[in-house]
């Protein structure tokens, strides 16, 4: 889905409001919810949206939300030198090994990262013809996320998703 659990967005907004990042990159931009949150709570932030499914860029007018939009897979994005990296419901769309490798790259360059991810079994296939919507690892748990991703300093769980803030 190009969107995610809206119950966790106030937590993300609070973190972004307190942080006031100079730069932020949103992987899995989808319909641009995190970009909109950044625009509202930290309007001076330079934002980059990264979306693997090109039709979403036009459908959701991502170029109107972010300062820059890239169409590519997060796993091949060239650098992560941002104050804030957002993984808004994308890590479940790749293998655990790929998610860990991506996290390790981010932890060497970014200052902070936010993860939003289902914490209950959440199978999902292709949606609206988008093969990237499939959940490759659909059984993450809160405990597994805490054990897998280094640097987590704050978290909040909701019925379906967990939100995690990491500092590097």
Task: List where the protein language model places each region.
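Conserved N-terminal segment of class I S-adenosyl-L-methionine
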Residues: 1-81, 100-103, 130-147, 151-168
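A short acidic, helix-capping loop that chelates divalent metal ions and anchors anionic groups
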Residues: 123-127
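Short N-terminal helix/helix-N-cap motif within the alpha/beta-hydrolase-1
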Residues: 95-99
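Conserved helix-to-beta-strand junction in the class I
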Residues: 105-109
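Short, glycine/serine-rich, charged loops/turns that create anion-binding
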Residues: 54, 120-121
């Amino acid at each position: 889905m190009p969107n995610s659990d809206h119950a966790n967005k106030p937590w993300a907004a609070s973190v972004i409001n307190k942080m006031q990042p100079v730069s932020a990159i949103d992987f899995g931009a989808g319909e641009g919810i995190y970009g909109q949150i950044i625009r509202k709570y930290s309007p001076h932030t330079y934002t980059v949206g990264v979306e693997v499914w090109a039709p979403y860029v036009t459908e959701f007018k991502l170029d109107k939300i972010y300062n820059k939009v890239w169409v590519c897979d997060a796993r091949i994005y060239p650098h992560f030198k941002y104050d804030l990296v957002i993984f808004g419901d994308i890590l479940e769309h790749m293998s655990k090994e790929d998610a860990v490798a991506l996290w390790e790259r981010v932890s060497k360059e970014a200052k902070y990262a936010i993860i939003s991810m289902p914490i209950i079994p959440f199978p999902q296939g292709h949606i609206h013809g988008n093969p990237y919507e499939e959940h490759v690892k659909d059984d993450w748990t809160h405990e597994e996320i805490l054990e897998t991703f280094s640097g987590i300093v704050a978290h909040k769980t909701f019925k379906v998703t967990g939100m995690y803030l990491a500092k590097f």
